[in-house]
Amino acid sequence: MKDIVDFIGNTPLIKLKYPSEITGCNIYGKAEFMNPAGSIKDRTALGIILDAEEKNLIEPGGTVVEGTFGNTGIALTMINNARGYKTIIVMPDGASEEKQSILRNMGAELKVVATKPYSDPGNYQHVSKRLVEELQSKGETSVMWANQFDLSLIHISEPTRPR
């Protein structure tokens, strides 16, 4: 039986009729909204988790921490639930109530912080990284920072799923 993670990727290409007609060439859109968590961030989150598993950065029952406005956190939570990991999301208070509600309903632990610029130590990304360091200093051995904005390996490695 397939797992929900198996349905990430393989999203259809949809021909965009009007732009194709006015340009004289075929123009297609990739329907990433058809991924299980509803966005292209499903691929990103899966790539992060597969990379972490391959490098033994996370163990069964471990914790994944990420700072996000929503879509990556939703995708990470879905994947982590399927793989048996706990998810802690640090989210700025400017994120939508809907995304906060979705994350809570999916089982993520949500920490909402004041919206701060990246240069501020209180920025949600910095807070998420510090949270990982705090958990590790308290003896948690299998906790990782997803760090979605450092995808240096994912974009040059094999795609997470066929395109």
Task: Map each language-model feature to its residues.
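Active-site-proximal loop->helix
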Residues: 72-134
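Short, small-residue-enriched loops and turns at beta-alpha junctions
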Residues: 37-38, 117-121, 152-155
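Short glycine/proline- and acidic residue-enriched helix-loop micro-motifs
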Residues: 144-153
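Positively charged, low-complexity intrinsically disordered leader regions
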Residues: 1-62
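Conserved beta-loop-alpha segment that forms the PLP phosphate-binding cup at the N-terminus of a helix
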Residues: 42-50, 64-85
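Conserved beta-strand scaffold positions in the cores of enzyme catalytic domains, especially
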Residues: 13, 27, 110-112, 143-145
